[in-house]
């Protein structure tokens, strides 16, 4: 907390460029300091908390990192929470395997393709293995230990134990709780033990996506922050196939996906990416996908969810006028 503008600016400038700072300022202090800190990479978002919204709202429009001008504390907390959720989702790394016939891809194709095949076999095995109450209890206990002292998540765990049923799995997956965080982390890091313990819930997601499988061709979008190294790996494999080794959440609304990227500040070694995906349910795909809006914790998000291990063909990668990389893919 700072009363002095110079001290505040100096503190921000001394932070590492990898730090991510959310700044809350008063209206008067904001007018003094925002012009000097707005361009700093460490600052990802600014909120103006003041008594006179009208006096500062028009002025704040000049600065893209100013997310909102608010007079109510609850509204401020709600806005920061919502924006943080979006930022986390976009920055969460994707686990991608490439199946390539490109001998110049820079790696042994046997090694690269082996990872791709393994990811496919893993999903198929998980869907066939029976689960037991012992495994479910072990998962719950591991999560309780992980979130010890976090009363919000412990309450979520208690509710999960009491009320979970297979038809609620999409609701639980889309709610920002231990369930989403732990499952996604396990899939992203290929933590086989944790994935094994989650297998009954992965099966439940699979069955629900099958039940609500989209019946018509869809074009969907996903905002993503991607490392330059990851992006280069995809650019070197245009025309090849990729497997997404986690649940792949997308939106039917392109304008919203682009808007979210427009507000994001990237790290030095990262780029803003928009996936554009054509998904036709009439092709012989083995992995289901569905519009889960009616079954989601956030029913207004027009979310289309693809099953773990969904395979896409990389069609094209180009940068648009807003310096966003557009990756065009087709579901296989």
Predicted regions and their residues:
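Mono-ADP-ribosyltransferase
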Residues: 1-332
């Amino acid at each position: 907390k700072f009363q002095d503008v110079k001290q505040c600016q100096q503190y921000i400038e001394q932070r590492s460029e990898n730090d991510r700072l959310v700044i809350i300022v008063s209206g008067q202090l904001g007018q003094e300091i925002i012009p000097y800190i707005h361009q700093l990479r460490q600052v990802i978002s600014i909120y103006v908390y003041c008594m006179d919204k009208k006096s500062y709202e028009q002025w704040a429009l000049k600065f893209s990192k100013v997310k909102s001008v608010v007079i109510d504390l609850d509204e401020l907390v709600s806005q920061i929470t919502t924006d943080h959720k979006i930022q986390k989702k976009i920055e969460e790394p994707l686990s991608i395997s490439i199946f390539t016939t490109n001998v110049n891809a820079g790696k042994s194709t046997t090694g690269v393709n082996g990872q791709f095949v393994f990811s496919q076999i893993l999903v198929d095995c998980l869907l066939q293995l029976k689960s037991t109450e012992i495994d479910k209890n072990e998962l719950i206990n591991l999560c309780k230990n992980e979130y010890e002292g976090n009363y919000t998540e412990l309450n979520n765990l208690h509710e999960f134990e009491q009320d979970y049923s297979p038809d609620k799995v999409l609701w639980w997956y889309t709610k920002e709780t231990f369930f989403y965080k732990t499952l996604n982390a396990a899939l992203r890091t290929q933590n086989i033990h944790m994935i094994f313990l989650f297998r009954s819930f992965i099966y439940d997601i699979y069955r629900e996506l099958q039940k609500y499988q989209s019946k018509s061709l869809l074009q969907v979008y996903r905002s993503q922050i991607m490392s330059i190294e990851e992006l280069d790996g995809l650019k070197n494999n245009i025309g090849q196939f990729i497997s997404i080794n986690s649940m792949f959440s997308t939106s039917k609304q392109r304008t919203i996906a682009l808007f979210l990227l427009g507000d994001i500040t990237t790290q030095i070694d990262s780029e803003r990416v928009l996936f554009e995906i054509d998904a036709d349910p009439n092709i012989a795909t083995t992995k289901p996908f569905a519009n889960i809006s009616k079954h989601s914790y956030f029913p207004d998000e027009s979310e289309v969810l693809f099953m773990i291990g969904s395979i896409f063909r990389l069609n094209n990668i180009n940068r648009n006028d807003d310096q966003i990389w557009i990756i065009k893919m087709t579901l296989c």
